[in-house]
């Protein structure tokens, strides 16, 4: 069985993977992303965007890695504000507030690195996002970055708003405060600087990470850039709200 099929089956049936045979573990990030690509086939779904895991020190500690990782957002795992998400087999059981950007032009791999200014010129719109991550590994904090790339960088469910009708381009997103809370009045506060220093820096990292690994990012794709706060513990039945101040808020329900 293809390792991506193992990951997808675990994603769907909730049976966590203890470990993979050594022969199935990739030896490089490029190999890991190449295997990750097969999730589209085994899920019988389409890729509508990308997520970045471990863009904060808290996020890196949470999954046991030293730097960010990229994962694919599947169409059937993408929701709208106020939707009800099935909690199901989610063992990670956290929610994360994130800035997301829609890409306005297809970016093919290049030998040179993109800079932040060039990347931001290609952004079509800013969006608000709540991610409910999960892992297919039982002990996700110890399996290492190559396995976590196979695991789609712990991607699971996302709720993403429409484009923000606000002149956000003039804002310093690194200083923009965010809070996320649930219906049990548990709240975590965050800030854009928690996302690799600035969500725009995180987006630039993602574009270059894909380019260096021979991956095209297509026009219209959404990139959710990573959590601005510590992951908020949640449970089935919660209403979860991420408040981005002047940019608005986004809420979802779970059951």
Language-model features and meaning:
Residues 228-232, 246-249:
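Short, charged beta-turn/beta-strand-edge "cap" motif at the junction between a beta-strand
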Residues 112, 208-213:
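A short beta-strand-loop-beta hairpin characteristic of the jelly-roll/cupin
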Residues 39, 160, 203-210:
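Buried hydrophobic packing segments
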Residues 2-197, 239, 247-255:
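Catalytic-core "active-site belt" of small-molecule-metabolizing enzymes
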